[in-house]
Each structure stands twice: as C-alpha cells, then as structure tokens.
Amino acid sequence: MDCLITKAEIIEQPYSGQFKERIYDISNQWNSQDWTWIKFEDENYYEWCGQFRGAQRAVALSSKHNQTLVATSDYLFQIDCVSGELTEFKSIDETQTIYQDLTVTPFGDFIIADYYNIELIGETIKDRQHS
C-alpha cells in the first residue's frame, strides 16, 4: 500500500471484487459474527476496503498522528495511515467498554466516548486520558 490514507468511511458490505479487500481480524473465542467495512482512499485516489470484526460504530482519521481508529462492537482498531497495517487494538471484551462515538479534534487528537465516559487519545490507543 505505502500511500497515505486520506479518507476513511463506513460502508455497507461491498460486492465481491468491487474493491481490493483486507481483513482485520483478531483471533478470540468471544468474537461476534458481525463485520464492519471501511472504505479507504489514499492520496492517489485509490480506493480499497478493510473488513473489521464487530458491528459498526465509528471511524476517524488523524493526519497529525497518521493513524485511523475504527471502533466496532468487538474492538478498537488502530491502523497506520502510511502502511495500512494494524498497529494496535483494544478488545472490548477486556474492558467491558462499548464505544459509541469517535471523532478528531482540530488539533488532530482522537476523542472517543462510551455511554458514560469520554477519552482523549493521542498517538496510540494506549495514550489515553480519561475525563
């Protein structure tokens, strides 16, 4: 891939062959049967699709950190915007936190919220500040 991801949006399951697809799945006995599809676009306007384990919640891209976060019912995924590689993930099963919304501040940091808490995420998922 090695082109900078410039857009990321949640889409419905694409037709087979419509996009080059990449599966982001974590082996876990508690995984749901749901999937989320994210359409990515790079700086050359090339579109491809990522398939993520769990029902769709939200996606956000930070050009400051060159990271995309994908929140599903099962995981919070962190994708590197240059390589398209999964760099970190957080299992919802471990924390019992079901994220509902995700956005990026004007300063390029992520804000993520569940039903009760708001967190500020910097460069990595581990770099979180609770409010």
Feature annotation, model-predicted:
Residues 28-33, 69-71, 112:
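Short, solvent-exposed loop/turn segments at conserved positions within beta-propeller repeat blades
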Residues 64-65, 72-74, 82, 106-107, ...:
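Short loop/turn segments that connect beta-strands within the blades of beta-propeller domains
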